[in-house]
Amino acid sequence: SPENCQGESQPCGCYCDAEGQGWPQDAEENGDIVCGEXTPC
């Protein structure tokens, strides 16, 4: 499963996959702005 990369290099909540791409996190769960798909981490 992807790791949470929030607070590392993105200004919004996202999950970072093994290839370093960010995927949106559930905004309702963490209350953060959601990243766009495939945003580089």
From Swiss-Prot:
Main localization (coarse): secreted
Location of this chain's protein in the cell: Secreted
Disulfide bonds listed in the record: none
GO cellular component terms, semicolon-separated: extracellular region
Expression tissues: Expressed by the venom gland.
Domain of life per record: Eukaryota
Keywords annotated in UniProt: Secreted
Function: Heterodimer A-B: Nigroviriditoxin possesses phospholipase A2 (PLA2) activity. It consists of a non-covalent association of a basic PLA2 subunit B with a non-enzymatic subunit A. Subunit A: The acidic subunit of nigroviriditoxin probably is a heterotrimer of three disulfide-linked chains generated by post-translational maturation of a PLA2-like precursor. It appears to have no PLA2 activity of its own, instead inhibiting the catalytic activity of subunit B. It is not toxic to mice by itself but increases toxicity of subunit B.
Family recorded in the similarity comment: Belongs to the phospholipase A2 family. Group II subfamily. D49 sub-subfamily.
Subunit composition and interactions: Nigroviriditoxin is a heterodimer of an acidic subunit A and a basic subunit B.
Protein's UniProt name: Phospholipase A2 homolog nigroviriditoxin acidic subunit A
